[in-house]
Design a protein with these regions (language model features):
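Short amphipathic alpha-helix used as the core "switch/output" element in two-component signaling
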Residues: 45, 66-77
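Two-component/phosphorelay signaling modules centered on CheY-like receiver
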Residues: 10-35
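Acidic, metal-coordinating helix/loop segments flanking the phosphotransfer/catalytic sites
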Residues: 34-53
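Active-site residues of response regulator receiver
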Residues: 56-58
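A short, hydrophobic beta-strand element within the central beta-sheet of small alpha/beta folds
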Residues: 78-83
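Short amphipathic alpha-helical segments
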Residues: 18-19, 48, 67-68
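Non-catalytic signal-transmission and effector/linker regions of two-component phosphorelay proteins
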Residues: 1-5, 15-18
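Acidic catalytic/metal-coordinating carboxylates
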Residues: 39, 64-67
């Protein structure tokens, strides 16, 4: 299983990302699990080192993607982070 953590505060972008992931899963037959977080603060608070990749929006309320990435790096050096 491939696990993706996604921090995105815009519901329309969340929907678009979900649709792309579902389409990719069907086309490739790869088992992908995506977890959405409303902002960087929620991601950092709930983070567990189970993700293969994190997709972070840079501009979000409470905690932006750059600050969230710095906090995650303190706990997990291996996860790939994409902005």
């Amino acid at each position: 299983m491939f696990r993706i953590g996604i921090a995105e505060d815009d519901p329309s972008f969340q929907k678009t990302i979900s649709e792309y992931i579902e389409r990719y899963k069907k086309e490739t037959n790869i088992d992908i699990q995506a977890s959405f977080f409303q902002d960087g603060n929620e991601l950092v608070f709930k983070y567990e080192p189970i993700y293969d990749v994190l997709l972070l929006d840079i501009e979000m309320p409470k905690m932006n993607g750059m600050d969230a990435a710095r906090e995650i790096r303190k706990r997990d050096q291996r996860v790939l982070i994409i902005f």
